[in-house]
Amino acid sequence: MRLSIEVPAAAKDPAALPRPEIQVIKTKIPGCVELRFPAIEDTRGYFAKIFHRPLWEDLGLCTQFEEEYLTHSVAGALRGLHLQVPPMQQDKLVLCLRGQAWDVALDLRRGSPTYGQHISRDLDSAASISALYLPVGVAHGFCVTGSEALFYYKVSSLYSPAHDAGVHWESAGISWPVQNPIVSPRDQTLLPLSDFRSPFNFKP
């Protein structure tokens, strides 16, 4: 006896599959976008999709990631402003999984209309599920504004200490919303923005 199984049209043609209703919000920094993910809730909790390759390709976002990280930070901690320089430069996706934080992106691409400028946003994991996508040449940092913050990262190249770089957190005109933050010795020794010689060129 042979079974006849009907294959759904969507399985034959991936383009026919439904796409998630991810909200894409452009920022003033070219290529840097906020992604807001809808949650499907029921009595058990919720479900949310944060990565959908076909949609990301349509948006021109990186889909090839090499590493993923988690960082847990306590109240008053400040991390940043970080990026990697060529040839280990990184596209980066940053998501706050738990807690409250103030998130910052700083454009360090020569020729960019927003070079040296930053964007910031308040994050509260209990209020929404959202991520920030940072293209190559945009540095990232954040400070914890609640009792803690758990961050998740996806990056497009492997971590390389020899190419790890950044800009001092006090040098870019950013009004951080915490006083006397907890900052690592390494972050305290980063160059000020005025002394940073950017190896990144903006590509419209």
Predicted features by range, described:
Residues R2-S128, S147-E148, V155-P204:
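Non-catalytic, conserved peripheral segments adjacent to functional cores
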Residues V104, L132, H140-T145:
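Short beta-strand His + acidic residue motifs that chelate non-heme Fe in jelly-roll/DSBH
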